[in-house]
Design a protein with these regions (language model features):
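Hydrophobic alpha-helical connector segments
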Residues: 91, 95-98, 106-138, 188-195
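Hydrophobic/aromatic-rich alpha-helical bundle segments in the mid-to-C-terminal region
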Residues: 154-159, 176-241
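A short His-aromatic
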Residues: 83-86, 90
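Solvent-exposed, amphipathic alpha-helical segments
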Residues: 49, 53-60, 107-111, 140, ...
């Protein structure tokens, strides 16, 4: 009888000890998870600030002047915070360009959504692309593309990002052309890419003098060629009733 009582007492003690340990462990895990979430949120905010600062530096000061020191000063963070998110300057620039490209795509998609239908979107493609090229992120991307001509590490870091973004752009243009009723969808995807490349070049030509008349005439010619392309693919534009 005494032995049974001792067994029961030992069992109750062990069960209480196990429950206490489990409760403490659960509370510790909960605190750890909350701390990790706070750390993650802070890290994400720091990363966002750094990317925004890098894009602004690229746009306003150029690639050569976009150093880690310049970015950390503009973002208002410590050098350690920068290096924790981006261990090298190349990683910082590549991260900023990836974000800039995504912002440019979002800008284009938002402008396209404002238009009434797929045909209107396709016909407006040249003007929408031109607007997108002129936003600060467009200038930052152009600056990095020029720098990648001689910076092999930057070119290597940007290559997979550019390939992914370009594939998304091509898919968007194919979907727009298909929805508009175009038969030769691939020709439209190529046309869209030609527009982007041409308009990016025009932004370069206008960087040091926005009033160059001949360059603006060239831009008008690009727009006129796009109208001809749309008439070939979609027929004449319908007059608004």
């Amino acid at each position: 009888m005494l032995t049974i009582w001792r067994v029961r007492l030992t069992f109750r003690f062990c069960r209480g000890l196990i429950l206490s340990v489990m409760q403490n462990r659960t509370e510790t895990i909960g605190r750890d998870v909350s701390a990790r979430r706070r750390t993650t949120r802070r890290g994400e905010e720091t990363r966002r600030q750094l990317i925004q600062a890098a894009v602004e530096c690229l746009c306003e000061r150029g690639y050569a002047a976009t150093s880690i020191e310049a970015v950390m000063e503009r973002a208002g963070v410590s050098r350690g915070s920068v290096l924790h998110q981006f261990p090298t300057r190349t990683a910082l620039i590549a991260g900023a360009i990836e974000a800039a490209m995504e912002i440019m795509m979002a800008h284009t998609r938002e402008r396209m959504r404002d238009l009434p239908d797929a045909e209107a979107r396709y016909r407006a493609m040249c003007d929408v692309f031109w607007e997108t090229q002129k936003i600060p992120e467009g200038a930052a991307v152009t600056e990095a593309l020029l720098a990648s001509r001689w910076d092999e590490a930057l070119a290597e870091a940007m290559r997979p990002v550019a390939m992914r973004v370009e594939a998304e752009i091509d898919d968007d243009m194919r979907a727009t052309a298909l929805a508009a009723g175009v038969k030769d969808v691939e020709a439209c995807a190529v046309h869209a890419r030609v527009l982007i490349l041409t308009l990016r070049g025009i932004t370069l030509e206008l960087m040091y003098d926005k009033g160059r008349a001949m360059i603006h005439r060239a831009l008008d010619q690009v727009r006129a060629q796009h109208v001809v392309h749309c008439e070939e693919m979609l027929g004449p534009a319908k007059n608004p009733s």
